[in-house]
Amino acid sequence: GCGAAATAIEKRDLVVQTKMSDSIFLEPVSSQKQIVYVKVRNTTDKDIEIEDQIKRAFELKGFKVVSNPDEAYFMIQANVLQVGKTDATDSDSALKSGFGGGLLGAGVSMATGGSGNNIGIGAAIGAVAGLLADTMVKDIYYSMVTDVEIRQRPAINEKIVQSEENYSDQGTSSTISQNVNTNDVQWKIYRTRVISTANQVNLQFEEAKAELSKGIAKSLSGLL
């Protein structure tokens, strides 16, 4: 019906948005210290490979990517937690819950319509046609939820006191407090959640997956 036509026009172009739950500000470094170690884990049931994309994104920015974390000045560790259909509300909720928080629900946003009442053959045919149009035009969202830990070496003579407390039932969500003090810690640690969302009429997963991966890679490489 009219709703399906409006959705088809409004959502004809693929739109991808990538957001972070928390802003992270890292100390600028000289080019000699632009060395990063990247490790990405995928704990979903989908075939997702974004580690190489993230590494290439850093290399294009002039960073040296190393396989030994002891050689790195920065460390990026990420876990792809969930990939699949969602809706705008679920994506916002998962983002607000932050690192280690709740994941997406099973909601899927789509345009649906109902048939007309039994008030005549013409009305019935029109209702069926409208229903068929509505079921063929679906407003599809796919999202990729990734928890990210970024580490940076302390500056010369900078001492870091770092404490961590798990407070979720699963022990996955944590807060980190840091103060410049006397204890010698190897890394300054920052955590955030990154969610990339793709939206388009009748969007297919394979097309969405490629764009979601690009969004995550671009977002993470932009941190340094």
For the regions a protein language model found, what residue spans apply to each?
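Intrinsically disordered, low-complexity segments enriched in small/polar residues
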Residues: G1, L103-G105, D169
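Acidic, Ser/Thr-rich low-complexity segments on the non-lumenal side of membrane proteins
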Residues: E165-I176
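Long, contiguous hydrophobic alpha-helical segments, chiefly transmembrane helices and signal peptides
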Residues: F58, I76-A78, Y142-V148
